Amino acid sequence: VGESTSITIGADGLGLISYFDGTGENLEVAHCDNTNCTSATITALDTGGNVGSTTSITIGADGLGLIAYFDETNENLKVAHCSNINCTSATITALDTGGNVGDGVSITIGADGLGLISYSDDTNLNLKVAHCSNTNCTAATITAIDTVGDVGLNTSITIGSDGLGLISYYDETNGDLKVAHCSNTNCTAATTIAIDTGGNVGDFSQITIGTDGLGLISYLDMTNLELKVAHCANQFCSPYSRRR
């Protein structure tokens, strides 16, 4: 147990962790019993096949956990909406069933209070985004926002200071780090840019917003085997500066 972990702080101020149980091939959740998380309540949320090999968790506008994850058995993007703060049960939805989709998943809550999910479409080699239609995320608007080459691996999503989604991801075709800046709250369109093209770079990226309101991205430089950081110069993350 303990693969593909993702952690957030719940409305009760305690840690909530999603992860993959590789032995049982289940999506599991651990709700910390105290601030130090020296013990936790463990729940197998989804046991229907090989599910949860990649997970991402956030807290919804209703104060309950929302987990996006990959169903490897059916090759679907799935979402679990926790029924209580401890997440001892959840409503499970197969959100995107159009091909081999849902790996490299990342979830956040948009300015509209609804879930926004980035992930890979391995059938069509695209970066896709799902914008939840309700708090439970039982339905969503699905959009392929980058379709040029083999793109969308190991995505990371956040909400920029402009209230729009900002996604970092790996372009495997060109070996580049790319960023997509959503054009609207639903992210039905986006501006995409390769922000580091120096060698084979950009896998395993993570993105957040700094105190200056600009994106900050960490990622792997596989050519030089180094950790790199890109600091966005504006809300669109174009141009940018790099540090290593």
Task: Go through the PLM ranges and name each one.
Residues 1-244:
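Extracellular, repeat-based ectodomains that mediate carbohydrate processing or recognition
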